[in-house]
Structure formats: structure tokens, C-alpha cells
């Protein structure tokens, strides 16, 4: 995992900065990364597959850098429809940022697809299982799990 971060230090540093939601976003990304690495071991992924999964997991929310900070401090039930749509665009923003950073296509797919659901109910495209890469499906599952286990304390945000 450390080697993957060293390959793309600028991307990892972006995730740690205040411009990307600060400590809470970084902690969430780290949780998702660690859980994904545990799954990679259990699924007996190759070292290359695990590296891709780990880096994609760490950077899955990098697009939040381009979402206004005030939206990151609102509870989801407080969003207006346009605000919800704007936050949902973080997948697209992440894809753009990842391309600017020169990230490989398999990591870009994780960043772009990490809110897709196998039944087609996710976003940004509403893709179904066969159109979502396996690493993106793993990150989506772990992302959802971490959000359930560690809800954001919006009073502190």
C-alpha cells in the first residue's frame, strides 16, 4: 500500500489537504483503503490488483476537492436537489483530477464508479454489475460500509 502511495504522492497529498474536506475525508479514505486491502488479501488478489485497489480506494473521493466546502458540512437530508446533484458530480470531478495527475485507467475507473450499484441504482451513470469494474464494486461496498460504521458528525464538521 505504501509503495502505491509513493508512486503517486501528489494525489495522496491532495487527499490529506484541507481543500478536500480535511481530516474526515482523509480518515474515511484511509478506512476504505485499509478495509479494501484486507479484502484483497482474503480474495487472494495479485499484488498488482491489490496495489490498484489500494490506490483507487485512497483516491476514490478526490473529486470532493471541487465540491464547495459548505456542502461537505451539510447533512445529506439538508441538500436541495441542485446541491445533491453537485455533490454527486464529485465522481466526474475525480475522474478529471485523476487524468490531470496521470493516473492509470484502472484507478480512474474506481474513482469514477465508486458510487455505482450492481442493480443500476447508483451514480454517475446508473451502471449495472457487468459494466462496473470489480475493484470499483469492492470500493463501493467498502465505502458504503464505512459510511454506516463511521457516520460524519455534522455538528463538528
Question: Which residue stretches match the model-derived regions?
Answer:
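A ubiquitous short alpha-helical element
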Residues: 19-24, 78-80, 126-133, 151-152
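Histidine/acidic-rich helix-loop-helix segments that form or flank divalent-metal centers
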Residues: 57, 85, 98-100, 104-140, ...
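Structural signal for well-ordered, non-membrane alpha-helices
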Residues: 94-95, 119, 146
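Charged catalytic carboxylate motif
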Residues: 31, 93, 137-140
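Active-site-flanking alpha-helical
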Residues: 67-68, 120, 150
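Acidic/His-rich, divalent-metal-binding segments that scaffold phosphate/diphosphate chemistry
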Residues: 1-88, 95-102, 106
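Active-site-proximal, acidic helix/loop segment immediately C-terminal to a metal-coordinating Asp/Glu
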Residues: 146-157
Amino acid at each position: 500500500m505504501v509503495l502505491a502511495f509513493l508512486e503517486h504522492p501528489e494525489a495522496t497529498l491532495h487527499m490529506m489537504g484541507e481543500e478536500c474536506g480535511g481530516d474526515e475525508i482523509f480518515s474515511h479514505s484511509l478506512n476504505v483503503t485499509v478495509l479494501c486491502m484486507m479484502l484483497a488479501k482474503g480474495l487472494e488478489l495479485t499484488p498488482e490488483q491489490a496495489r490498484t485497489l489500494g490506490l483507487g480506494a485512497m483516491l476514490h473521493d478526490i473529486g470532493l476537492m471541487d465540491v464547495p466546502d459548505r456542502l461537505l458540512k451539510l447533512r445529506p437530508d439538508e441538500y436541495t436537489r441542485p446541491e445533491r446533484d453537485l455533490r454527486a458530480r464529485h465522481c466526474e470531478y475525480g475522474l478529471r483530477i485523476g487524468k490531470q495527475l496521470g493516473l492509470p485507467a484502472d484507478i480512474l475507473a474506481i474513482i469514477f464508479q465508486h458510487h455505482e450499484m450492481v442493480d443500476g441504482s447508483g451514480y454517475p451513470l446508473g451502471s449495472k454489475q457487468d459494466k462496473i469494474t470489480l475493484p470499483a464494486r469492492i470500493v463501493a461496498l467498502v465505502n458504503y460500509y464505512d459510511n454506516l460504521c463511521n457516520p460524519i458528525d455534522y455538528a463538528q464538521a
